[in-house]
């Protein structure tokens, strides 16, 4: 992306990651892949990736996340945090970060309520600050299990969230809106396929509609493929597509992001 790979001398330094490909947008941590145990107690998961390219130009990319989940009886308390730093020739290109606090209450084996709040900044997407708060209901619609060799699930979530965004004014035309505070609907669909407790494929689609303008909506689709190496370690391939129907004028309305790395769960 930053260099013509056929004409440059390339050196890769990878820390807990084999490849990190970034096209236009920010990688969003998909909470579906991080915690899959349904037992009381504390779980911790982490993802790290780093890529260094040197030659006619110097590019450094660092991505990270640290996440906690605590379950007691029917309640789940979760904290997600992470970010991404990109520099070229020792000049910062992007520095993004996020944190999310989430609470889930399990009504029964198929249904749960959820509440969350999230704070985010992203230089590529021009966010100085993005603050979210929402709640909703999640229902399992499909649950197919054949002994221990195959498991298929499909969940549907509905809810509402309040979204406050403050954009970087220095990059926008003088008269363009830089502050919004919108109420959006939440619609998400999560499908998962697990084979022999080794391979898991998760597809998640989020649709967020501004309640007072049908032309303003956001769509995110993410596919995660995890191959379990041992009890605590999985190889992860993520492909993410994001669409914003009304992006800032300096941005395109589509992002694509892919990552290959490792997920560590304790």
Language-model segments: residues:
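Outer-membrane pore/translocation modules
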Residues: 90-184, 236
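Solvent-exposed loop/turn segments connecting transmembrane beta-strands
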Residues: 52-60, 88-94, 121-129, 210-218, ...
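Outer-membrane beta-barrel "beta-signal"
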Residues: 254-266
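Outer-membrane beta-barrel transmembrane domain signature
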Residues: 151-231
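Transmembrane beta-barrel strands of outer-membrane/channel proteins
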Residues: 48-50, 66, 79-83, 101, ...
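Transmembrane beta-strands of outer-membrane beta-barrel pores
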Residues: 50-54, 72, 83-87, 119-123, ...
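Structural signature of outer-membrane beta-barrel channels/translocons
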Residues: 69-73, 104-106, 122, 138-144, ...
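Short loop/turn motifs that connect adjacent beta-strands in outer-membrane beta-barrel proteins
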Residues: 32-41, 71-76, 110, 125-127, ...
């Amino acid at each position: 992306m930053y260099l013509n790979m056929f004409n440059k001398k390339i050196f890769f330094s990878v820390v807990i990651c084999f490849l990190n490909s970034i096209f236009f947008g920010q990688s969003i941590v998909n909470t579906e892949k991080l915690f899959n145990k349904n037992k009381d107690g504390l779980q911790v998961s982490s993802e790290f990736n780093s890529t260094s390219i040197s030659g006619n130009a110097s590019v450094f990319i660092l991505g990270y996340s640290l996440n906690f989940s605590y379950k007691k009886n029917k309640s789940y308390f979760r904290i997600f945090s992470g970010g991404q730093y990109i520099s070229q020739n020792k000049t910062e290109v992007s520095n993004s970060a996020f944190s999310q606090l989430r609470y889930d209450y399990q009504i029964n084996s198929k249904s749960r309520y959820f509440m969350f709040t999230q704070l985010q900044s992203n230089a590529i997407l021009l966010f100085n600050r993005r603050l979210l708060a929402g709640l909703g209901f999640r229902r399992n619609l499909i649950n197919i299990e054949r002994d221990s060799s195959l498991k298929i699930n499909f969940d549907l979530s509905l809810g509402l969230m309040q979204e406050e965004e403050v954009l970087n004014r220095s990059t926008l035309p003088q008269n363009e809106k830089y502050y919004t505070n919108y109420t959006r609907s939440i619609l998400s669909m999560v499908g998962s396929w697990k084979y022999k407790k080794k391979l898991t494929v998760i597809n998640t689609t989020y649709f967020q509609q501004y309640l007072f303008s049908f032309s303003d909506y956001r769509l995110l689709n993410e596919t995660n493929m995890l191959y379990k190496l041992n009890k605590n370690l999985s190889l992860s391939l993520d492909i993410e597509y994001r669409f914003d129907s009304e992006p800032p004028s300096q941005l395109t309305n589509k992002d694509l992001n892919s990552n290959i790395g490792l997920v560590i769960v304790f």
